[in-house]
């Protein structure tokens, strides 16, 4: 099998794994006119894209680590343009939605602690516009009248920068765009070791 990968072609970069992270790296490199080979295992292998919610999440990230907060905010700000470009390149909708990430609180103490933590979190990055609101139960019910709240929900924090994309569509779009850019994918070729 190793010989079959030598295919009379040399590669600038070989990416191990065609999941979301590997596909995103390979997609980006192929955009810089790099000759990229992406190796992957079987279709039945575990993929994070199959198990995650596709969150593009900012609120609360990087508490006590302001650089992580800044990076998360910048990434979320870049997502609409990234999603639109990838959709235009592939014709695959990512089902990207933004503007409402909720973290529910089940007691007054939890809601108060959440508000205090998020206030401190926003204070760590004064250059960033505030993007979080604390909603009590009645505000939640007014804002989301069709949402059925459990009896213990007293409120929530709302991240106005938060969103989500369909992770399976994102994976399909990244892999398709990578191949359109000239990248080569070899499925059924798991990387089991790397030798210098």
Residue ranges and their predicted role:
Residues 157-196:
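Helical element adjacent to the flavin cofactor pocket in flavoenzyme catalytic cores
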Residues 40, 136, 187-189:
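Short loop/edge segments at beta-strand edges and connector loops
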Residues 31-51:
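Glycine-rich FAD pyrophosphate-binding loop
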Residues 54-143:
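Dinucleotide-binding Rossmann-like beta1-alpha1 core, especially the glycine-rich loop
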Residues 1-6:
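Short, Lys/Arg-enriched N-terminal segments with co-localized hydrophobic residues
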Residues 42-44, 140, 174:
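Short beta-to-alpha linker loops that shape the active-site pocket of alpha/beta-hydrolase fold enzymes
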């Amino acid at each position: 099998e190793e010989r079959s990968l030598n295919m009379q072609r040399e590669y600038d970069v070989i990416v191990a794994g065609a999941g979301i992270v590997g596909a995103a790296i390979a997609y980006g490199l192929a955009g810089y006119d790099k000759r990229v080979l992406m190796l992957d295992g079987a279709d039945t292998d575990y993929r994070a894209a199959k198990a995650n919610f596709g969150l593009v999440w900012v609120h609360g990230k990087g508490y006590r680590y302001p650089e992580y907060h800044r990076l998360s905010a910048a990434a979320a700000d870049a997502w609409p343009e990234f999603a639109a470009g990838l959709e235009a390149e592939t014709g695959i909708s990512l089902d990207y939605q933004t503007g409402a990430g909720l973290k529910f609180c089940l007691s007054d103490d939890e809601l108060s602690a959440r508000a205090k933590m998020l206030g401190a979190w926003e204070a760590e990055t004064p250059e960033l516009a505030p993007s979080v609101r604390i909603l009590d139960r009645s505000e939640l019910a007014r804002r989301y009248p069709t949402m059925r709240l459990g009896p213990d929900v007293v409120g929530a924090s709302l991240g106005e920068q938060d969103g989500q994309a369909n992770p399976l569509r994102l994976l399909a779009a990244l892999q398709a765009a990578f191949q359109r850019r000239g990248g080569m994918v070899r499925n059924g070729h798991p990387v089991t070791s790397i030798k210098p």
